[in-house]
Amino acid sequence: ENSTLTLEDTEKILSGGTLARNVNVREVFEAKKLATLTESLLEKNNSALNIKRILALHKTLLTNIDEPIAGRFRTGKEWVRVGNHLGSNPQFVPALIQELVDHYNQHKSLYFLDAVAHFHAEFETIHPFVDGNGRMGRVLINLQLMHLGLPPIIIQNKSKHTEYYPLFTQYQSTMKFGGFTELFALLLQESLHKRITILTAKKIIPLSKWALQKGVKPNIAANKAKRQTIPAFRMREKWMIDEAYSPSN
């Protein structure tokens, strides 16, 4: 979040390469830590969601980056503000997160994406940490999905300001989280389409090329991809699809 690193920069860092430009050392550490955190989810995705695990994940995220605040909630006078939103009073943060975790674990009859969406909206509204709230919130989404046997989702950087951040303003003024449910449903479909296509497609091509081959207007193809009415998905933030896919399939 708020990083100047490009996708290509991040890939070079994680593969041990050297960047051709100077970057903030903290951002390099943050990229590596987030990768480590993601790997840990793959190894331990059956663990239940609880306070201990949330704090352990946060500690992994910020160790060697900001040790004094790693692995603990805000306390004392550690107030945080994001735009016009003021995070919850530090005095009540531990209790608020415990209530949120209990609500998530106890309401098993709730539609699973509604449960994940509500948890995420409320977690970010509380903003329990001094730093790393956005990254932690998105990590927890994937922890919850993977615990249900589903693949992780990616909230694309390019569309955050138009499709993701406005949903928080809506939630904080109305307490309605349906927008998050709808967004996560689309991203989950995209994640599944991506995995199925990678495993089954003979050739994967850009959506723009596919549209040209099939005689579909590019803007119509793009809209279908965004609505997930065709099995398109993003790689390096570019829409892709199985070359053999036909709209009549």
Where are these regions (language model features)?
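FIC/Doc superfamily catalytic core
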Residues: 1-131, 135-249
